[in-house]
């Protein structure tokens, strides 16, 4: 049996089907563009899904692909096994041939057998096939084409050999081909109890799409039958390289050996698994970034972060003290960049993201590992780590749950998933609408039904902190239920009346407890639906709760009081801003929490330190004067005539609540407030910033949180004094000296950057690409300032007459574009136009400059992967 490289296996598969009139279709992005139910492309057929369902027509009816695929979440979550088993991967390549109403079962089986036994030279006696137990035509074709006897054609009754796209749609039986690695490896034939062992390995799966599932009872024949096949490249290569572990094939071994040369730890024992994890996760991370995903804390970005951080933890286990992953990228690009050019195009961007993420995680990784070691000192084999510790590792140290599980795996310690999930839910679902999810339209109807039946909720919280109420509705998973009896279940509760304030008018909702006939219910949030239904978001802590029961509803008084003081302070702040900044100041938004307030206003410039001091002094003076705070219900028109402030664009009922604070403030407001301004205690602005053109944001704290802030700042000052080995009287002088030294170092750095960008004529020739007599030098660089880039680019265009220089510098959250054109060709190429087009392409607002030199900006880092194509289009045209 001939030994093939990974590249040869891929190439031979594609070449074979191209020779048989299949169109070679390039791999699609890992991000599905036609299936919102999928997080990632996980098989070759995904990009053809609409073709199979008849929603899309292509110019061809036969196709062959090598599709990059990823499985690391949801149904196909292989992450915990990756690196520890022989065939689990996050990223893998799926080879496939497809027929859309052209050839069917017999021809598909012929192609499979012909390619395996003739092109790949697999011994026929090593091959077994499975079919769906009623698929007699497939059995007859295998006998006719391959000469297989009945004992080599295994009939499977389970759905493993019957594929469907869902409850309805195209479906059909499958036929799988297995390779026998030999008696020396343990395992049984498909359909036996030992089928999941390593002797008999599935190498190819064919789906014969011959039916359409109409409903559970009805299945009809399709008029045009289709074929969908998949062969895992890594599995097939392992067979053809005579190894029983995918990580032993040439592609992985080259990455592993390259890694070993850097970390200097031998590839054996436990280290072997770490090398495999890193090799696999390097591929997954790099391809995801190339396809536009960047690490984040949600969705696809979080899957990427989980993969990257798992790899980084294994790099740490190998003793890597500095970022490692980005150093391995050139080897991956060398191995796979030709077949997947997006890797080459995005190489510098991928490298930057890998390095940044590893630097970011390094500190918290070490601290988190220290915490985990401390918390598991007393845990024995078979023990369970508390959900609280797992959540702290996740929330404080950035440890994905599966990373914590991976670390504990070798010690046979598990994690309390239930406890972890409870803490996750408490954190995630404090926002008012987080529970809506994908059932929003269904939920809307549910709330309309509730309002129609029960009317609005009566709010008692202006005068009461607790009240006896009747439970009129319980909602779980967007469905009305009669009772809740599972402890720690989350649900929504509606009463006929309540002292709990529902989030509105910028004020967050109340928290507290509900008691009813032996039950205890924690309220973790309160909000409004349809403006008048007050909804309590609850967790059952004890007993059970039924519709129709009377219950005692108790708000958290301290939490409410902190909301009151911050809300009243917001009104005072608004009035003081009118006095100091002018009557033209209009509120653009606000948020009142139990720990701070946020207030947005229209204002054309930054508020000065002097103005901030004046604002604080006047607000605190009003607080000290202990003015009475009163509320009155008035007709909206009358309130506005009396000078009450109403928010522009806000809808008000005919009658409104008006809050008056002494002679200082008069506003329409439905929120809760203190009785006297002295209850606020004190007021301190903690930040002032721009959030949009002409919009400023002020954040402030009140009462006990001012004391807390002073203590924190005092502690920080003492820490700084200690670090600088000085006292507060000499601290400013010390800082000025450091800043002056920093300026000197920056000048030296600028000189170094300029020198690094300076090229000889010979170097320019080597680093440029030429088309129609024009040389293009394109470089992505780090965070180098525009002045240096401009000078460097101009210097180069003075050396060569037909040169266009384009630098793109990566800033923290933006891109900087510098374009220079040799003066001899400025009649044909304008640097200002090129810079403007590149800026618009990269999400900027355009730019400009002279014909020979121009600069602009952008912020679309993802689109940077397509910049070469855009740049050449500008030059060629």
UniProtKB/Swiss-Prot annotation:
Catalyses: tRNA(Ala) + L-alanine + ATP = L-alanyl-tRNA(Ala) + AMP + diphosphate
Q: Which UniProt keywords apply?
A: Aminoacyl-tRNA synthetase, ATP-binding, Cytoplasm, Ligase, Metal-binding, Nucleotide-binding, Protein biosynthesis, RNA-binding, tRNA-binding, Zinc
User: What does this protein need as cofactor?
Assistant: Zn(2+)
* GO MF assignments: alanine-tRNA ligase activity; aminoacyl-tRNA deacylase activity; ATP binding; tRNA binding; zinc ion binding
Stored InterPro entries: aa-tRNA-synth_II/BPL/LPL, Ala-tRNA-lgiase_IIc, Ala-tRNA-ligase_IIc_anticod-bd, Ala-tRNA-synth_IIc_core, Ala-tRNA-synth_IIc_N, Ala-tRNA_ligase, Ala_tRNA_ligase_euk/bac, DHHA1_dom
User: GTP-binding among the record's keywords?
Assistant: no
UniProt domain comment: Consists of three domains; the N-terminal catalytic domain, the editing domain and the C-terminal C-Ala domain. The editing domain removes incorrectly charged amino acids, while the C-Ala domain, along with tRNA(Ala), serves as a bridge to cooperatively bring together the editing and aminoacylation centers thus stimulating deacylation of misacylated tRNAs.
Its protein name is Alanine--tRNA ligase
Please tell me the species this chain comes from. Answer: Rickettsia prowazekii (strain Madrid E)
């Amino acid at each position: 049996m001939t030994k093939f490289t990974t590249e040869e296996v891929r190439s031979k598969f594609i070449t074979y089907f191209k020779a048989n009139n299949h169109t070679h279709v390039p791999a699609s992005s890992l991000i599905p563009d036609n299936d919102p139910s999928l997080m990632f492309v996980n098989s070759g057929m995904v990009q053809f899904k609409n073709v199979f369902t008849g929603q899309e027509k292509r110019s061809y009816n036969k196709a062959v692909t090598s599709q990059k695929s990823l499985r690391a979440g949801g149904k196909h979550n292989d992450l915990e096994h990756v690196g520890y088993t022989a065939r689990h991967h996050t990223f893998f390549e799926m080879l496939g041939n497809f027929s859309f109403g052209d050839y069917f079962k017999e021809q598909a089986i012929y192609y499979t057998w012909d390619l395996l036994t003739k092109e790949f030279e697999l011994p026929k006696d090593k091959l077994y096939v499975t079919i769906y137990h009623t698929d007699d035509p497939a059995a007859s074709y295998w006998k006719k084409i391959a000469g297989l006897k009945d004992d080599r054609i295994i009939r499977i009754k389970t759905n493993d050999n019957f594929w469907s796209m869902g409850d309805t749609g195209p479906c059909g039986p499958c036929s799988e081909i297995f390779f026998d690695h030999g008696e020396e490896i343990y395992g049984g034939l498909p359909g036996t109890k030992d089928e999941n062992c390593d002797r008999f390995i599935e190498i190819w799966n064919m789906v014969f799409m011959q039916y359409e599932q109409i409903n559970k009872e009805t299945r009809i024949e399709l008029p045009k039958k289709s074929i969908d096949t998949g062969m895992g490249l890594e599995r097939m290569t392992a067979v053809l390289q005579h190894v029983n572990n995918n990580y032993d094939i040439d592609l992985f071994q080259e990455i592993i050996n390259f890694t070993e040369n850097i970390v200097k730890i031998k590839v054996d024992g436990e280290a072997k698994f770490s090398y495999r994890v890193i090799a696999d996760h390097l591929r997954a991370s790099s391809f995801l970034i190339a396809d536009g995903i960047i690490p984040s804390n949600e969705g696809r970005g979080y899957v990427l972060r989980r993969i990257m951080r798992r790899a980084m933890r294994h790099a740490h286990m190998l003793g890597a003290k500095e970022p490692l992953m980005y150093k391995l990228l050139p080897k991956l690009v060398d191995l796979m960049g030709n077949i997947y050019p997006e890797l080459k195009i995005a190489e510098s961007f991928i490298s930057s993201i890998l390095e940044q993420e590893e630097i970011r995680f390094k500190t918290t990784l070490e601290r988190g590992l220290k915490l985990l070691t401390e918390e598991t000192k007393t845990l024995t084999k078979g023990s369970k780590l508390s959900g609280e510790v797992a959540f702290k590792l996740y929330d404080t140290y950035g440890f994905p749950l599966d990373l914590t599980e991976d670390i504990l795996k070798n010690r046979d310690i598990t994690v309390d998933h239930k406890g972890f999930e409870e803490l996750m839910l408490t954190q995630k679902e404090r926002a008012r609408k987080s529970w809506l999810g994908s059932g929003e339209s269904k939920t809307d109807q549910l709330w309309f039904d509730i309002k129609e039946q029960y009317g609005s909720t009566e709010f008692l919280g202006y005068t009461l902190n607790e009240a006896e109420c009747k439970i009129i509705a319980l909602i779980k998973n967007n469905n009305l239920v009669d009772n809740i009896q599972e402890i720690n279940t989350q649900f929504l509760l509606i009463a006929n009346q309540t002292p709990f304030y529902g989030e509105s008018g910028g004020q967050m909702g109340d928290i507290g407890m509900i008691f009813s006939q032996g039950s205890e219910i924690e309220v973790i949030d309160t909000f409004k639906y349809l403006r008048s239904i007050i909804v309590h978001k609850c967790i059952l802590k004890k007993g059970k709760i039924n519709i129709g029961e009377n219950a005692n509803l108790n708000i958290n008084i301290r939490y409410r009081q902190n909301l009151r003081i911050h809300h009243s302070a917001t009104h005072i702040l608004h009035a003081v801003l009118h006095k100091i900044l002018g009557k033209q100041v209009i509120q653009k938004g606000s948020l009142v929490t139990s720990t701070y307030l946020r207030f947005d206003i229209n204002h054309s410039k930054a508020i000065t330190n002097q103005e901030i001091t004046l604002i604080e002094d006047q607000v605190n003076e009003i607080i000290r004067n202990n003015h009475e705070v009163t509320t009155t219900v008035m007709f909206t028109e009358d309130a506005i005539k009396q000078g009450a402030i109403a928010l522009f664009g806000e809808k008000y009922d005919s009658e409104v609540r008006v809050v008056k604070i002494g002679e200082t403030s008069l506003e329409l407001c439905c929120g809760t407030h203190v009785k006297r301004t002295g209850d606020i205690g004190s007021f301190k602005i903690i930040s002032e910033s721009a959030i949009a053109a002409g919009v400023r944001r002020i954040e402030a704290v009140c009462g006990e949180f001012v004391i807390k802030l002073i203590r924190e700042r005092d502690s920080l000052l003492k820490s700084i004094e200690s670090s600088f080995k000085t006292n507060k009287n000499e601290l400013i002088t010390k800082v000025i000296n450091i800043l002056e030294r920093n300026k000197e170092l920056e000048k030296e750095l600028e000189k170094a950057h300029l020198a690094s960008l300076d090229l000889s004529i010979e170097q320019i020739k080597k680093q440029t690409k030429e088309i129609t007599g024009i040389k293009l030098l394109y470089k992505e660089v780090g965070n180098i300032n525009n002045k240096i880039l401009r000078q460097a680019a101009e210097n180069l265009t003075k050396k060569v007459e037909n040169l266009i220089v384009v630098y793109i510098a990566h800033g923290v959250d933006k891109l900087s574009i510098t374009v220079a054109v040799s003066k001899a060709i400025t009649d044909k190429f304008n640097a200002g136009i090129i810079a403007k087009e590149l800026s618009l392409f990269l999400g900027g607002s355009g730019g400009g400059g002279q014909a020979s030199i121009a600069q602009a900006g952008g912020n679309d880092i993802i689109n940077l992967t397509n910049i070469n194509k855009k740049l050449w289009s500008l030059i060629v045209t």
